[in-house]
């Protein structure tokens, strides 16, 4: 089940004693639909004793003596949490490491929630008396290198209570060889040590590269085994790409030639020239023929030209009649006939032996020159000579020719029969069946196909007979292969057009109708969309250009709740002088969105209830001494319970002046939960900025833009993670020094800040890293571009990865990559949410964030990720949070990234339209289905956790153990993993979210805009796109295997991903085919119309999209520049990227002082010593720190809980490195 979030309101003693350990909802015992978690059937914990801490009432229980101010007027029934009727049975799934909820289930199995056997709510079991407050052992029951696959429901024995005041030894991670392995662990280790057979992929790569042995590769600069393996995998991938390109080329150009070979010569009726003579529907070239001497024909005469009667172009079928075949028995000898016969009754001829015109205009001529049977060629020699002639081609009729009313034509089995030739029968010579005359005189069969009319045995004989005696040609037909090729062509055409059209129209529908649902009702910017779009375009002309000032007073956030009144509501007054200005509009039938703040709406502010009275100094917005001590005594957030402090019992005996209990005097006060300046409940956001080698101007631009967003400072905090002690190329100071120079009002002086250890995302000895945590407030600087009236107080925390003492003298100490910077926050959020053991660094992050915000870190629901060279539009954060709050199914989103240095060079110019089309076409289309495959790391937002079902139930999203575990993968040993994790970590995070939560949404919010500078040198662009293209290919390979995405078969996101993958792989071949098609269309005939039309549509639809969605006509010019640069986009960049599949460096994209580009992921980094990293729960750290600060003996108290309000997740003692 999703992790419960249950506050502990005050209850009566009677209630405490009589409360049942089970809840009311019969569906809570069912596993959560999203995670499929099934609680253990046998409770692993001992039963609760009488007199211990009572169970809290369910948030939706009628016995709960509190009611949230913003509670849903139509609350969701608890049965909604249960699994709905479905054909899907999660319990039948195979739960292995490939399962999207594998790690979540392992964590959830250890939650303090006992399963219900009566169908009531799950029970939060407080095992206070069973926990060990201190431990004398420095060793844990696990190893950093151990793979844990055991039963997640295995019960954990409670520890023994230690004597009061016994000093607690630090808990540390230890190596595997420092403890004894259990039998189960030995078995697993033995399985891991087994040599596994090579995979099919490795075998294929070895076969493809058999011609390059290792010794040869070593001579070409590949001494490391990992390098050679990456090179072989690269060649394997390139071979597959070439095969796919060859297949596409075959379908485009070779398939028709293969299945529809060029037919023989076919001559259209009435177009057979004088060099041919027609016999039985075939044209014979008699241009060079010589006839033997015969009566009326000289020796070696050519019958086409040398005789008085010119036979060229005529039909001579009557001169070589097919007699006594199918017509035997139908056409018989007439009484008194002169036609010769033999003993079998075979006739010598049926018609007069003469020729007739091919157009059927010849009159019937029954006379014979010289003698009866002249020119009938009845001798064997004549017949054999005729049969030896080679037919030049077939004479064909079109259906228009057949339906010509001037002729009496019909079709039988593909042969064209001239029924008027039946008039040439001589009654005195032969007799024929009456059916012949009926067919000839029946006007309804003229121009028709008689194949299905003549179906009886007799009728079929009549049809075959007519074919033998009256055939004049064949119907114009195509072979099966030609028909198949046309079917493939038109199906492909329709298919591609359907995809292009659907993508275009759905993207347009998203821009016009769907996108507006995400936007906030009111912001600090103008409410006119056209005016705002123009301001954004002007703003993006220069990276340093400030945002426009507020020009529309009606849209300001001051005093606005984001709602518009209806005309009908003005008839009667809806408010009075006693109505709170922050009152929630309960007239709406839709339930209000759920946030952490709205769920804590029964909380009140510090004594006095008003942030500007009693506890606060109204002039300087600072806490007075009494308020600061009150906050320090509670160690909770500024939102305190209206009836009791959440965990005041934990801190009752602590000195409020201790180092942990201090909250900064400049902390931004929290407004009431009912305050909705933008029309939706506010949610707390962490703005994560990852910095590497950026300069002062770039970082200042980014932090200024975040600090001056119109989103309230009480609900946002800036977190900057500096990836090592790095000095950018051409910079006078290191990046950490630059960032620290932008902070003020430090909680701890920078020179007094210590470095703390944590487990980094790396390999070998680099897994141990150290970092410093600086907490304070953002300082705009003395020469700030920001107007002093706009400078606001924004809490800020900086994490500087400084490295271990061993790497202090090395290059780039502390540098572990951007993914490690993100994991620092993600892992921290996971451990806060699950109350797991955390490192010292994470404990300091907890304290630092709480001291400068007054909020517990678990109150933060979203993370805005911004690169340190990006500038955010003032209302972008407001729109992004609006989308998240309005739709809890959205787990990730991104805004539009615009280019600030458009005219820096031709390299930057060709990127303008590419950025535009990637957002407004690709991402808009994917947003319709909630499946944006790539959320750019420079400007995106992820949901930390999402409300689920009833009140106070939350599901971890970004903080989900499966996300954190997979994203923090440190065993990167294959080409696929290296491209995913070393080059495209931002895109891989989006892929990982979709794989883990395929039913949730990732969308594009066009109202959120940022600007950035793009590469203006071609070598930098080449390096950047190499990383992006290779990352795209490998992420699409991962995503195409996810079967649970929206839709089915061809109408699914999975199929769209497959098409994108194939399209990306064949880009170089496709552009080559395009140019070939254009060239052959110019130089050869006939012109291939269909491919050209398809090409025009594909290239022309974006122009229509510009007209309908863009706000400047200049984008037409940018599109023209983009089309001219298509060879670069579709050939040069992809081909270079494919050839560099085994290059995992960032190349020219981010250069530091004195850095030399090298291939990443191939160096040996030593051995990881886990004993240097201490991990404890927050309560243990807190107790130890306060005990040391007070200098007194710590009296054992019930286990400390973090100020999140969540119970400790018992069962996470050891740190596991999966």
From Swiss-Prot:
Query: Do the record's keywords include Transferase?
Result: yes
Give induction info.
Expression is increased in cells shifted from 25 degrees Celsius to 37 degrees Celsius.
Question: A single GO BP annotation from the record?
Answer: chitin biosynthetic process
Signal peptide position in this chain? Answer: none
Q: Which SUPFAM superfamilies match?
A: Nucleotide-diphospho-sugar transferases
User: Temperature behavior, per UniProt?
Assistant: Optimum temperature is from 30 to 45 degrees Celsius.
* Record-annotated membrane-spanning stretches: 200-220, 235-255, 487-507, 1062-1082, 1087-1107, 1115-1135
Main role? Polymerizes chitin, a structural polymer of the cell wall and septum, by transferring the sugar moiety of UDP-GlcNAc to the non-reducing end of the growing chitin polymer. CHS4 synthesizes a large amount of chitin and appears to play a role in the process of cell separation. CHS4 is particularly well suited for functioning at the higher temperatures associated with its poorly characterized saprophic environment and with human infection.
Q: Which PANTHER family match?
A: CHITIN SYNTHASE, CHITIN SYNTHASE 3
Family under the similarity heading: Belongs to the chitin synthase family. Class IV subfamily.
Protein name per Swiss-Prot or TrEMBL: Chitin synthase 4
């Amino acid at each position: 089940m999703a992790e419960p979030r249950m506050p502990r309101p005050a209850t009566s003693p009677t209630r405490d004693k009589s409360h049942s350990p089970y809840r009311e909802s019969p569906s809570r015992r069912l596993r959560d639909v999203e995670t499929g978690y099934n609680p253990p059937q046998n409770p692993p914990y001992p039963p609760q004793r009488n007199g211990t801490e009572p169970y809290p009432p369910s948030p939706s229980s009628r016995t709960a003596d509190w009611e949230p101010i913003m509670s849903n007027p139509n609350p969701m029934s608890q049965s909604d949490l249960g699994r709905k009727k479905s054909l899907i049975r999660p319990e039948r799934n195979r739960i292995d490491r490939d399962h999207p909820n594998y790690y979540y289930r392992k964590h959830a199995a250890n939650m303090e929630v006992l399963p219900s056997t009566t169908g009531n709510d799950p029970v939060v079991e407080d095992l206070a008396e069973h926990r060990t407050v201190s431990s004398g052992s420095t060793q844990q029951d696990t190893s950093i290198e151990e793979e844990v696959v055991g039963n997640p429901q295995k019960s954990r024995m409670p520890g023994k209570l230690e004597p009061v005041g016994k000093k607690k030894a630090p808990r540390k991670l230890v190596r595997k060889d420092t403890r004894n392995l259990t039998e189960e662990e030995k078995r697993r280790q033995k399985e891991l040590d087994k040599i596994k057979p090579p995979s099919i992929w490795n075998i294929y790569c070895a076969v493809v590269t058999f011609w390059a042995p290792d010794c040869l590769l070593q001579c070409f600069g590949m001494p490391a085994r990992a390098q050679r393996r990456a090179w072989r995998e690269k060649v394997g991938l390139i071979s597959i790409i070439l095969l796919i390109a060859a297949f596409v080329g075959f379908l485009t150009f070779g398939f028709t030639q293969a299945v529809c070979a060029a037919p023989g010569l076919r001559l259209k009726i009435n177009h057979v020239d004088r060099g041919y003579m027609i016999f039985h529907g075939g044209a014979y070239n008699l241009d060079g023929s010589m006839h033997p001497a015969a009566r009326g024909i000289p020796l070696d005469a050519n019958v086409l030209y040398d005789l008085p009667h010119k036979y060229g172009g005529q039909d001579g079928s009557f001169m070589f009649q097919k007699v006594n075949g199918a017509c035997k028995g139908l056409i018989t000898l007439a009484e008194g006939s002169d036609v010769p016969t033999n003993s079998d009754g075979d006739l010598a001829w049926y018609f007069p032996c003469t020729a007739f015109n091919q157009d059927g205009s010849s009159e019937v001529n029954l006379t014979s020159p010289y003698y009866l049977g002249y020119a009938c060629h009845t001798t064997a020699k004549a017949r054999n000579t005729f049969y030896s002639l080679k037919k030049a081609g077939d004479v064909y009729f079109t259906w228009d020719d057949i339906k010509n009313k001037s002729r009496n034509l019909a079709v039988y089995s593909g042969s064209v029969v001239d029924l008027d030739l039946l008039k040439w029968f001589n009654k005195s010579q032969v007799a024929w069946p009456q059916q012949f005359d009926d067919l000839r005189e029946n006007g309804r069969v003229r121009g028709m196909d008689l194949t299905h009319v003549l179906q009886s045995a007799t009728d079929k004989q009549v049809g075959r007979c007519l074919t033998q005696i009256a055939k004049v040609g064949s119907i114009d037909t195509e072979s099966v292969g030609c028909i198949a090729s046309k079917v493939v062509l038109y199906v492909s055409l329709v298919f591609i057009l359907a995809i292009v059209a659907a993508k275009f129209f759905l993207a347009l529908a998203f821009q016009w109708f769907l996108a507006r649902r995400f936007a906030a009702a009111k912001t600090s910017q103008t409410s006119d969309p056209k005016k705002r779009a123009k301001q954004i375009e002007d703003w993006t002309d220069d990276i340093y250009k400030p945002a426009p000032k507020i020009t529309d007073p009606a849209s300001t956030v001051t005093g606005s709740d984001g709602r518009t009144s209806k005309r009908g509501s003005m008839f009667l007054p809806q408010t009075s002088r006693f109505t709170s200005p922050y009152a929630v509009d309960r007239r709406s039938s839709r339930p209000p969105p759920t946030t952490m703040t709205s769920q804590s709406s029964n909380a009140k502010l510090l004594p006095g209830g008003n942030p500007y009275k009693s506890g606060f100094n109204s002039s300087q917005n600072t806490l007075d001494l009494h308020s600061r001590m009150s906050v320090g005594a509670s160690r909770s957030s500024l939102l305190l319970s209206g009836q009791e402090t959440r965990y005041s019992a934990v801190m009752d005996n602590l000195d409020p002046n201790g180092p942990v209990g201090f909250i900064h005097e400049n902390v931004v006060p929290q407004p009431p939960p009912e305050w909705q300046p933008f029309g939706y409940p506010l949610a707390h956001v962490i703005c994560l900025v990852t910095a590497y080698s950026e300069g002062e101007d770039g970082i200042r631009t980014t932090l200024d833009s975040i600090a001056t967003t119109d989103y309230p400072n009480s609900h946002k905090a800036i977190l900057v993670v500096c990836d090592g002690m790095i000095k950018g190329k051409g910079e006078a100071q290191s990046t950490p020094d630059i960032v620290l120079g932008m902070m003020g009002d430090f909680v701890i002086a920078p020179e007094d800040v210590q470095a703390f250890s944590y487990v980094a995302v790396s390999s070998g000895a680099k897994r141990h890293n150290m970092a410093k945590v600086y907490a304070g407030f953002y300082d705009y600087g003395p020469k700030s571009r920001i107007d002093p009236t706009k400078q606001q107080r924004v809490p800020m925390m900086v994490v500087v990865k400084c490295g271990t003492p061993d790497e202090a003298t090395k290059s780039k100490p502390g540098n572990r990559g951007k993914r490690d910077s993100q994991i620092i926050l993600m892992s921290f959020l996971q451990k806060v949410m699950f109350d797991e053991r955390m490192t010292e660094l994470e404990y300091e992050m907890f304290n630092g964030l709480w001291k400068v915000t007054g909020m517990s870190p678990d109150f933060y629901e979203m993370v805005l990720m911004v690169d340190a060279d990006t500038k955010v539009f003032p209302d972008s954060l407001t729109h992004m949070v609006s989308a998240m709050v309005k739709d809890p199914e959205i787990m990730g989103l991104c805004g539009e990234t615009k280019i600030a240095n458009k005219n820096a060079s031709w390299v930057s110019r060709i990127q303008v339209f590419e950025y535009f089309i990637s957002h407004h076409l690709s991402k808009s289309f994917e947003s319709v289905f909630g499946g944006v495959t790539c959320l750019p790391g420079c400007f995106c937002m992820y949901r930390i956790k999402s409300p689920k079902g009833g009140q106070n139930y939350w599901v971890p999203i970004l903080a989900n153990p499966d996300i954190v575990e997979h994203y923090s993968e440190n065993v990167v040993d294959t080409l696929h993993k290296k491209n995913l994790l070393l080059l495209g970590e931002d895109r891989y995070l989006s892929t990982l979210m979709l794989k883990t939560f395929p039913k949730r949404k990732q969308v594009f919010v066009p109202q959120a805009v940022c600007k950035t500078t793009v590469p203006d040198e071609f070598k930098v662009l080449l390096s950047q796109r190499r990383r992006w293209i290779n990352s795209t290919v490998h992420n699409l390979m991962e995503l195409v295997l996810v079967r649970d995405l929206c839709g089915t078969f061809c109408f699914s996101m999975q199929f769209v991903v497959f098409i994108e993958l194939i399209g990306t792989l064949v880009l170089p071949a496709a552009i080559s085919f395009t140019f070939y098609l254009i060239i052959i269309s110019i130089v050869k005939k006939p012109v291939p119309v269909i491919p050209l039309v398809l090409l025009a549509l594909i290239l022309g639809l974006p122009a229509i999209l510009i007209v309908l969605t863009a706000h400047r006509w200049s984008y037409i010019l940018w599109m023209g520049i983009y089309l001219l640069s298509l060879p670069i986009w579709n050939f040069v960049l992809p081909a270079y990227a494919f050839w560099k599949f085994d290059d995992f460096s960032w190349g020219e994209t981010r250069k530091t002082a004195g850095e030399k580009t090298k291939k990443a992921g191939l160096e040996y980094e030593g051995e990881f010593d886990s004993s240097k990293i201490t991990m404890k729960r927050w309560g243990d750290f807190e107790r130890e720190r306060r005990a040391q600060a007070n200098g007194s003996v710590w009296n054992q108290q019930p286990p400390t809980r973090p100020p999140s309000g969540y119970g400790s997740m018992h069962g996470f003692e050891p740190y596991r490195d999966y």
